[in-house]
Amino acid sequence: MSNWLDTLADVKRVGYGDKAQFHVKQEGIRAYIQAKGSTTARSKVASKTFSLDDTLSVSARPVVNLVELQTNQVAMADLIRDAAYQMELAELAYIQKVLNDAIETWEKPYYAEGTGVVKATLDPMVRHWVRMSGGQAPALFGDIEMTSKLAELTGFNGQYADQLIVEQNNAGVIGTYLGSKVVNLINPLIDHSDVPTFDCNKLYLVPGFVDASMRPLKVVYEGDVTSTEATHIDDLTYEVRLDQYFNAAVVVGDRPYIGVYRDTNN
């Protein structure tokens, strides 16, 4: 449905009753300079294990008239597909809230905000991750509401370079900014509304040297989607209940291996 979760989260899928184990990077080994023969301070183990023990349940329960079902006026497969989609939306809304609650406690260069996309604020955040990665710029990932504003920060006033004009016209965004690849968030609208699924006012800085296990957003899915069905003779209805167990948490070790810029205008 979207590239949001795969881009920002460390996701594990376990069987029923199993616990997801996440390894969180800690401060790691340090080196010290001292007089010859002196005792060197010890370095702590470079990672710890975090377990998401408790899971939550997201459920949906579509009901259909039995006669309509038997006469093929309603396709149960379509109802189940719609129910599963609504469950996924509910899960993602919860996971996004978990992340949002955490990131607003972070400080620069991992979290910053401004009125619009402020070059003087965003650029130091990009440079931080370039240094962290040994020269590799982070990806800039966000809704087109944010990524489309990056062209204005390129330093061209009144007249853009031809390449930027072509990129902006073809994709709605420029391809790179300060060496960072600009990636559009796939942000579908919630059914029967004009409300996007994910925040439109955040630009995520995703460092390329970080694998999924280092991301602070941890998500676990316990088992597959289960279904239970029943037929009711009193009102001639048929129903299916779908359940999925999941949970999310933000766990920060030595640092949050992601950056977030928020536009306070939106």
Sequence positions of predicted segments:
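Assembly/oligomerization interface modules of large self-assembling protein complexes
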Residues: 1-58
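N-terminal short leaders/motifs
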Residues: 4-10, 85, 188-198
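Residues in well-ordered beta-strands of folded domains
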Residues: 23, 51-53, 61-63, 141, ...
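A short, structural micro-pattern
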Residues: 56, 134, 234-236
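Alpha-helical scaffold segments that mediate packing/assembly in large oligomeric complexes
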Residues: 59-133
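Short loop/turn segments at secondary-structure transitions that flank enzyme active sites
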Residues: 89, 93, 146-148, 246-248
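Extended, solvent-exposed, turn-rich assembly/linker loops in the middle of proteins
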Residues: 103-174
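Sequence/fold signature of self-assembling virion shell proteins
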Residues: 156-266
